[in-house]
Amino acid sequence: MKKENIPLFFATLQAANPEPRTELEYTTPFELLAAVLLSAQATDVGVNKATRKLFPVANTPQAIYDLGVEGLEEYIKTIGLYRSKAKHLIETSRMLVELHGGEVPRTRAELEALPGVGRKTANVVLNVAFGEATIAVDTHIFRMGNRTGLAPGKTPLDVELKLEKRVPPEYRLHAHHWLILHGRYICVARKPRCWECAVATFCDYKPKTPAPKTA
């Protein structure tokens, strides 16, 4: 992607969705952290289905910890890898209570010290809960960074660091959401919907996927 096209690329995404939001349902930083922990290799739809039952019963670190691993598993067993996720969330809840007064920390180092929390999860929490201009690179953003030529890289960290350099400051806060939503619904893994893509003219991907033929 040509450097001069990057501002136009993001301006177009902004015009289509001025205030993008995560599709995970949450009301507090801890609910967001819990939902993101549960979302690894799972869909937001599946996570929301589970947390709609879990959060009315337990939506604080102490309440989650009080459920215990087996109690928590009953609420999240419809989600993939639920056993390991339950252990991580219980241990994370314990650490939040004992080390952070039951609050979600606001620094990357403290977040990444929590069980199951890596760079991507920390970036989501910092961006969505605390309004920091971080970019969490998931499978959709990794694919888009390489396919479009916006931020090609061999690893998610490569893509993240290039995005930090290339995304204009005025678009940095919402860049994560614009890219993930575009990758989820338009720039999909197989047969990207180029015919519906508002930013196709700026993208390096060739040949563009034609619109499906109608009968």
What are these regions (language model features)?
Residues K2-T214:
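Catalytic cores of DNA base-excision repair glycosylases
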